[in-house]
């Protein structure tokens, strides 16, 4: 299936697509950034105690820890 190039469409088709997109966007539920950012911040802070990227991985449970040294003789 060939790619659709907007610039190749007639003006009427472009306007139809734009109206279609605007109809989809107007149905979206919107929230204030201040409220959403506070919720995201709380979510992150609540889970940071279990986050291995924040608290680290215990040495005994680290799957990437070298098991021993390599000796070439």
UniProtKB/Swiss-Prot annotation:
This is Guanine nucleotide-binding protein G(I)/G(S)/G(O) subunit gamma-11. It is found in: Cell membrane. The keyword Lipoprotein applies. It is a lipid-anchor. PANTHER family: GUANINE NUCLEOTIDE-BINDING PROTEIN GAMMA SUBUNIT. G proteins are composed of 3 units, alpha, beta and gamma. Interacts with beta-1 and beta-3, but not with beta-2. A lipid is attached at residue 70 (S-farnesyl cysteine). PROSITE patterns: G_PROTEIN_GAMMA. It comes from Bos taurus (Bovine). The modification Cysteine methyl ester is found at residue 70. Keywords: Cell membrane, Lipoprotein, Membrane, Methylation, Prenylation, Transducer. Belongs to the G protein gamma family. It holds the Pfam family G-gamma. Its main location: membrane. SUPFAM superfamilies: Transducin (heterotrimeric G protein), gamma chain. One of its GO terms (molecular function) is G-protein beta-subunit binding. InterPro entries: G-protein_gamma-like_dom (IPR015898), GGL_sf (IPR036284), Gprotein-gamma (IPR001770). Residues 54-73 are annotated as: Disordered. The keyword GTP-binding does not apply. One of its GO terms (cellular component) is heterotrimeric G-protein complex. GO terms for biological process: G protein-coupled receptor signaling pathway. Guanine nucleotide-binding proteins (G proteins) are involved as a modulator or transducer in various transmembrane signaling systems. The beta and gamma chains are required for the GTPase activity, for replacement of GDP by GTP, and for G protein-effector interaction. The lineage of its organism: Eukaryota, Metazoa, Chordata, Craniata, Vertebrata. Residues 71-73 form a propeptide.
